[in-house]
Amino acid sequence: MTNTRKTHPLIKIINHSFVDLPTPSNISAWWNFGSLLGLCLVIQILTGLFLAMHYTSDTMTAFSSVTHICRDVNYGWLIRYMHANGASMFFICLFLHVGRGLYYGSYIYFETWNIGIILLFAVMATAFMGYVLPWGQMSFWGATVITNLLSAIPYIGTTLVEWIWGGFSVDKATLTRFFAFHFILPFIITALVVIHLLFLHETGSNNPSGLISNSDKIPFHPYYTIKDILGVLLLILTLMTLVLFSPDLLGDPDNYTPANPLNTPPHIKPEWYFLFAYAILRSIPNKLGGVLALIFSILILMIFPLLHLSKQRSMMFRPLSQCVFWILVADLFTLTWIGGQPVEHPFIIIGQLASILYFIIILLILPAVSMIENKLLKW
């Protein structure tokens, strides 16, 4: 008698994706982040669902409904802070996942890669709209500043912004629609994740060496299910340490002040995971130029397969490219730091230099270094 897991129409799909999936025998802990992102998504959807049961998306009651969740709902504080800090863990895993893809040349699977970038945009949009919902000062002014960027679009900009706002400023209509979109987007993300996995399983996983590993595959279960559990435990440990010991570490104190359209906070800044893009946006004095730089700072990931000029896929055996890669990482840390600083000397010039360096490394230095390495290896 054949095994149900191999014959049942539904269970068969799960079996081929998570149990009998042929996996390279040498993938490192850097390949854990896919499953960790899946876990983050599940945590966010579940905590978000319970928060939505108590939250009201009205300008008069939104702030007090979040207060009510934290004070009066059973374990409401836990659910709220797990959701807020879960977003931070989500982005940490996302950045590491993308970084792994860049380092080991996973972008060669360009369908999987491009869907991954669409996923990144979708998660960023969801996080932005979620940040508006508590209706604190930074929620309100963050929404005002970021949506206002669309007014830089020639001809239709102003109309577009008012259409998104549902009025002449960020108000009740804006909050209600942001809540609706914030609720629906995670399910769209889940559908995209399925497509992401579908494309990945067409080709199989990459591995640290960047070489074809068809001759040496092992089943996903039990080897990588056990290996992933370590990552899961570390993720939950980090998240719960953050939630239980310093839940407001990554938040902004201004968001504990209810939204007031008449009082602008001294420093408007987004959550930490958007600071690198915010620094790039601010480094260009022109509004439209800044918006374009902001979009291209993420979209540039899509052209990585075209910029790959090396004869080797992975950076594992390319020390020069490794150096450039880690300079890029340091540059992103610099941009993140600058994004949280006020717009004054010397932060302005540091931000501008870091922004220019970001684009130069990706568009010029990495491809050039790849060519040099090819020459050194007489390829």
Swiss-Prot record:
<feature type="transmembrane region" description="Helical">
    <location>
        <begin position="288"/>
        <end position="308"/>
    </location>
</feature>
<keyword id="KW-0349">Heme</keyword>
<keyword id="KW-0999">Mitochondrion inner membrane</keyword>
<keyword id="KW-0813">Transport</keyword>
<feature type="binding site" description="axial binding residue">
    <location>
        <position position="196"/>
    </location>
    <ligand>
        <name>heme b b566</name>
    </ligand>
</feature>
<keyword id="KW-0496">Mitochondrion</keyword>
<feature type="binding site" description="axial binding residue">
    <location>
        <position position="97"/>
    </location>
    <ligand>
        <name>heme b b566</name>
    </ligand>
</feature>
<feature type="transmembrane region" description="Helical">
    <location>
        <begin position="33"/>
        <end position="53"/>
    </location>
</feature>
<keyword id="KW-0830">Ubiquinone</keyword>
<dbReference type="GO" id="GO:0008121">
    <property type="term" value="F:ubiquinol-cytochrome-c reductase activity"/>
</dbReference>
<feature type="binding site" description="axial binding residue">
    <location>
        <position position="83"/>
    </location>
    <ligand>
        <name>heme b b562</name>
    </ligand>
</feature>
<dbReference type="GO" id="GO:0045275">
    <property type="term" value="C:respiratory chain complex III"/>
</dbReference>
<keyword id="KW-0679">Respiratory chain</keyword>
<comment type="subunit">
    <text>The cytochrome bc1 complex contains 11 subunits: 3 respiratory subunits (MT-CYB, CYC1 and UQCRFS1), 2 core proteins (UQCRC1 and UQCRC2) and 6 low-molecular weight proteins (UQCRH/QCR6, UQCRB/QCR7, UQCRQ/QCR8, UQCR10/QCR9, UQCR11/QCR10 and a cleavage product of UQCRFS1). This cytochrome bc1 complex then forms a dimer.</text>
</comment>
<dbReference type="GO" id="GO:0005743">
    <property type="term" value="C:mitochondrial inner membrane"/>
</dbReference>
<feature type="transmembrane region" description="Helical">
    <location>
        <begin position="77"/>
        <end position="98"/>
    </location>
</feature>
<protein>
    <recommendedName>
        <fullName>Cytochrome b</fullName>
    </recommendedName>
</protein>
<feature type="transmembrane region" description="Helical">
    <location>
        <begin position="347"/>
        <end position="367"/>
    </location>
</feature>
<feature type="transmembrane region" description="Helical">
    <location>
        <begin position="178"/>
        <end position="198"/>
    </location>
</feature>
<feature type="transmembrane region" description="Helical">
    <location>
        <begin position="113"/>
        <end position="133"/>
    </location>
</feature>
<feature type="binding site">
    <location>
        <position position="201"/>
    </location>
    <ligand>
        <name>a ubiquinone</name>
    </ligand>
</feature>
<comment type="similarity">
    <text>Belongs to the cytochrome b family.</text>
</comment>
<feature type="transmembrane region" description="Helical">
    <location>
        <begin position="226"/>
        <end position="246"/>
    </location>
</feature>
<dbReference type="Pfam" id="PF00033">
    <property type="entry name" value="Cytochrome_B"/>
</dbReference>
<dbReference type="InterPro" id="IPR005798">
    <property type="entry name" value="Cyt_b/b6_C"/>
</dbReference>
<dbReference type="Pfam" id="PF00032">
    <property type="entry name" value="Cytochrom_B_C"/>
</dbReference>
<dbReference type="InterPro" id="IPR030689">
    <property type="entry name" value="Cytochrome_b"/>
</dbReference>
<comment type="function">
    <text>Component of the ubiquinol-cytochrome c reductase complex (complex III or cytochrome b-c1 complex) that is part of the mitochondrial respiratory chain. The b-c1 complex mediates electron transfer from ubiquinol to cytochrome c. Contributes to the generation of a proton gradient across the mitochondrial membrane that is then used for ATP synthesis.</text>
</comment>
<keyword id="KW-0472">Membrane</keyword>
<dbReference type="InterPro" id="IPR036150">
    <property type="entry name" value="Cyt_b/b6_C_sf"/>
</dbReference>
<dbReference type="InterPro" id="IPR016174">
    <property type="entry name" value="Di-haem_cyt_TM"/>
</dbReference>
<keyword id="KW-0249">Electron transport</keyword>
<dbReference type="GO" id="GO:0046872">
    <property type="term" value="F:metal ion binding"/>
</dbReference>
<dbReference type="InterPro" id="IPR048260">
    <property type="entry name" value="Cytochrome_b_C_euk/bac"/>
</dbReference>
<feature type="binding site" description="axial binding residue">
    <location>
        <position position="182"/>
    </location>
    <ligand>
        <name>heme b b562</name>
    </ligand>
</feature>
<keyword id="KW-0812">Transmembrane</keyword>
<dbReference type="InterPro" id="IPR048259">
    <property type="entry name" value="Cytochrome_b_N_euk/bac"/>
</dbReference>
<dbReference type="InterPro" id="IPR005797">
    <property type="entry name" value="Cyt_b/b6_N"/>
</dbReference>
<keyword id="KW-0479">Metal-binding</keyword>
<keyword id="KW-0408">Iron</keyword>
<feature type="transmembrane region" description="Helical">
    <location>
        <begin position="320"/>
        <end position="340"/>
    </location>
</feature>
<dbReference type="InterPro" id="IPR027387">
    <property type="entry name" value="Cytb/b6-like_sf"/>
</dbReference>
